[in-house]
Swiss-Prot record:
Residues 195-219 are annotated as: Disordered. It comes from the Bacteria. Keywords: Cytoplasm, Ribosome biogenesis. The gene is rimP. CDD domains: YlxS_C. GO terms for cellular component: cytosol. GO terms for biological process: ribosomal small subunit assembly; translation. The keyword Cytoplasm applies. This is Ribosome maturation factor RimP. The lineage of its organism: Bacteria, Pseudomonadati, Pseudomonadota, Alphaproteobacteria, Hyphomicrobiales. Disulfide bonds: none annotated. It is found in: Cytoplasm. It comes from Brucella abortus (strain 2308). The keyword Ribonucleoprotein does not apply.
């Protein structure tokens, strides 16, 4: 692994005003409760925690900076910091692989601000209960408001309203759909950050770091 970036040692803790509206359940929630304060202290935001049966057991922790970036060095820093905390708390039985990654381009949408930041792009949204006659929605994010998001369908669907307002408290899962427009806009934003047009730091990584990952095995 590369050396820890010195700037990260003095990161400002992330404010919790923009809390996640989509949260984990079960063991994932237990792990999230352990690692989120640690990640915030480093200056990052937790996106998602998921324990899967991939390669035995894999604990995936998605994180990002407040500006949405996440480099390989960032992943390594988070990995080195949360690993000993998880060793002490020991929330998972048996061996597992710890994987720290960025949200990627087709990212999960877990905060109200995510919907506003990616307005104009296509997303898939699921609700915890039936809403407007269904629980699954797909469409362009028209606008993210204080308590809801409006989705305009990008596909012909007979019997369903083309424009639907979905309250945030009903959303159980949401993520962007990978499109050419999304890839172009994500890379444009990444380039702008590197050139200093948008405030940001530690921007020396290549665009591929949008999907960067750091993995280690835990016993």
């Amino acid at each position: 692994m590369t050396e820890q970036v010195q700037a990260n040692e003095t990161e400002t803790p992330v404010a919790v005003a923009d809390e996640r509206i989509i949260r984990e359940t079960g063991i994932d929630a237990k792990v999230a409760g352990i690692v989120e304060p640690v990640i915030n202290t480093l200056g990052f935001r937790l996106v998602r925690v998921r324990l899967s049966g991939l390669n035995g057991q894999t604990l995936q922790i998605m994180a990002e900076r407040p500006d949405g970036t996440m480099t390989v060095d960032d992943c390594e820093l988070v990995s080195r910091t949360v690993a000993p905390v998880l060793d002490v708390e020991d929330p998972i039985s048996g061996k597992y692989h710890l994987e720290i990654s960025s949200p990627g381009i087709d990212r999960p949408l877990v905060r109200k601000s995510d919907f506003s930041d990616w307005a104009g792009h296509i997303a898939k949204v699921e609700t915890s209960i039936v809403h407007e006659g269904r629980k699954k929605f797909r469409g362009r994010i028209v606008v993210g408001e204080a308590d809801s998001v409006t989705i305009e369908s990008d596909q012909i669907s007979y019997g369903n309203e083309p424009v639907v307002r979905i309250p945030f408290d009903l959303i159980s899962d949401a993520r962007l759909v990978l499109t050419d427009d999304l890839i172009r806009d994500a890379l444009r934003k990444d380039k702008a950050l590197r050139e200093g047009r948008i405030p940001g730091d530690d921007l020396g990584a290549e665009p591929e770091d949008v999907a960067s990952t750091e993995t280690q095995e835990k016993k």
